[in-house]
Amino acid sequence: SEVMIRTHNLQVQSKNYFICIKDSALVIEVLKTIKLLSDENQWGDFGTVNKLIVQNMCCKRAFLRGAFMVAGSVTNPEKGYHLEIAVLSAKLAEQLKEEMSAFEIDAKIVERKKYQVVYIKEGAQIVDFLNVIGAHMALMEFENVRIVKEVRNSVNRQVNCETANITKIVNTAA
């Protein structure tokens, strides 16, 4: 077996990782282990991941991590809070939402073009998701931006309140 990495020409950051297994018996063993092939050598349902694979919390985390790495994105928190995973199958989107709910993450699903998009809009929920999938550095960067935004908003609210109070006092005195 060997691992190969291919970089996309259009996106410098984007890499695909491939595991090349040359031994056919080992390929069958791997396919059976991940439940894509039954013990009777029948193909499984490609629309979802077999429930036996995602029974444990560690497996749920790995499943969500893999889905996010393959088909996910998160917007710059300075612009807004939005995390999404775009998949082709409605059943897989429902499964992703279900696995997120095991970690008390309330995701939504919307259809966009040919994709089912599982998304989170709330900042705290995005932080929880990043923690679940083990993206701790991204979580810290996200939180730092969130904290700065909250402080700015708080200061702006206080300034607006003080300005309104001063305006009321001036208007009352006049």
What are these regions (language model features)?
Residues 132-174:
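Extended mid-to-C-terminal alpha-helical interaction segments
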Residues 1-2, 6-146:
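DNA-contacting interfaces and partner/effector-binding or oligomerization modules
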